[in-house]
Amino acid sequence: RRQRQMCIRDRFRLATVQDFSAVTAACLLVRTAVYDELHGLDEEFTVAYNDVDFCLRVRDAGWRIVWTPYAELYHYESKSRGSDENDPAKKARFDAEHERLYAVHGRENILHDPYYSPSLSLDYEDFRESGDLRNLK
């Protein structure tokens, strides 16, 4: 049922090769020269957002972040290290890295993703419409 709901809501977006602002480092393919030029993943993002930061730097350097439906993997987020929500120290680290991402790349740049429709909700992961269409410009 969830898969059917996703297909209806995303209008088959996930079946299309397309540009994204960032993808997960769990499945990231990048030219060595680009990785080296940008000095790889920023180790100051010890757990969270190192992939997002890297992708944003790749994009700022003039390269594209391309997502393809033809690569398939299973990624169990936080499976090996556990949830950040249940551990106050992990939660604090996550929150600090979140704020650092805003500081490095600008809050507005993060919140106004050029590859994500402003008519879609940021509160859900299933491409449902935003309840506040005033955000459209």
Where are these regions (language model features)?
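Glycine-centered small-residue hotspots that permit tight backbone geometry or close packing
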Residues: 1, 40, 77-80
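Short, small-residue-biased leader/transition segments that mark boundaries at the very start
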Residues: 3-8
